[in-house]
Regions:
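Iron-sulfur-associated redox domains of electron-transfer enzymes in respiratory
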Residues: 1-174
Length: 174
């Protein structure tokens, strides 16, 4: 779940601005059948660490600068379509969605962690461009798609309503 999704969901249901609704979202997702729920804030930190290392490496080795982020698939498409000369400036790092999906899929490849279940990684993002990111060639590990499904904030809200959940009254879960 992306941070912007949390804010939009709380706003949609008229909840107090600035108050975290992540626990309520976790509850709703569990009621809809999700086993585990992860926040992309963790993987955003991983992305920043990787981009920092890449930036330092570029400085030390005199490689192409400035370093442009690759976190937003719409931005990457814009650069690759309109400004091809800046493609070498794009970071090679995955987005937080891509990082989290790869980490979770790798962890649950181990049968001890998977508990006999197949891991399906569903990403909840504010932007439809994340759907295209999930099927890019660099979003696969060993031939397997890392992010299986991407749903938008609007789609999540529709799911909550279709399940008949009264979001405002849900108790927070961890």
């Amino acid at each position: 779940i992306a941070p912007a999704v949390r804010v939009a969901v709380g706003d949609h249901y008229g909840l107090t601005k600035g108050k975290s609704v992540m626990g309520k979202i976790v509850n709703a997702l569990h009621r809809m059948g999700f086993d585990e729920v992860y926040d992309t804030s963790f993987s955003a930190d991983l992305t920043i660490m990787e981009e920092s290392a890449e930036f330092l490496d570029r400085i030390k080795k005199g490689k192409k600068l400035p370093l442009l982020t690759s976190c937003c698939p719409a931005w990457v498409k814009f650069i690759t379509d309109q400004y091809k000369e800046y493609i070498p400036n794009l970071s090679t790092c995955r987005s937080p969605q891509g990082m989290l999906s790869a980490v979770i899929k790798e962890y649950f490849r181990d049968p001890e962690h998977a508990g006999g279940k197949k891991t399906v990684m569903i990403s909840i993002m504010p932007c439809t461009a994340k759907k295209a990111e999930a099927v890019r060639p660099n979003s696969f590990t060993d031939g397997e798609q890392d992010t299986d499904i991407v749903i938008t904030t609007t789609e999540l809200l529709r799911m909550i309503d279709n399940f008949g959940l009264d979001f405002a009254t849900l108790d927070p879960e961890a």
